[in-house]
Amino acid sequence: MLGYKWKRARLSLKSKRNKDEFELKQGQINDLKQLEDSGYIDLYYGDESHFGLTPNVPYAWQLKDKPLLLPAAKGKFLNVVGLMSRKNDLFFQVLESTFNTDKIIDFMNSFVEQINKKTVVILDNSPIHRSNKFMAKIQEWKEKDLLIFFLPPYSPELNLIEILWRRIKYNWIPLDAYLCFQNLKERLSFVLNNFGKKYDIIF
């Protein structure tokens, strides 16, 4: 149809956010990108994502008389926390349980030990990022050259790691990953460990 194209619809949070705050933070992130491009800092985008046995795109080429049947499995899942740079560097951890503040703090503590220059991590306003425990660690990390930059509410498009999660879920994980939990673990691990090599994103 003229003027239309077939594509996946996305949910939008634009109506809920503060436009002025969004534009301010967007400008600050652009400044951080320039500092990174000049070599003054490293810049990472952080987030958590959930992976279960229900495929995000249940479409595949199938024989007409042999449809591909996926088990209706629920319950088991994987959670990934990651820090991604525009250079396709990825620091991540996978858990078979939910993340909480203590686990995120441990993850950030591990990350700060391997940075070698002033580093900024961009995070959303998830409760585990804004908890008293997490906020109490910010000064300690700052003293180790790790700074936290919080996004404005309802602004996922400013967090580039959201693109990574979409690519993994909609493009990179093969459909057979959802046949069983072991397959999911193996396929997800392969993608995560090969990001920046076999899999990449041009920002």
Language-model features, listed with the residues they occupy:
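Short functional hotspots at interaction and active-site rims
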Residues: 1-203
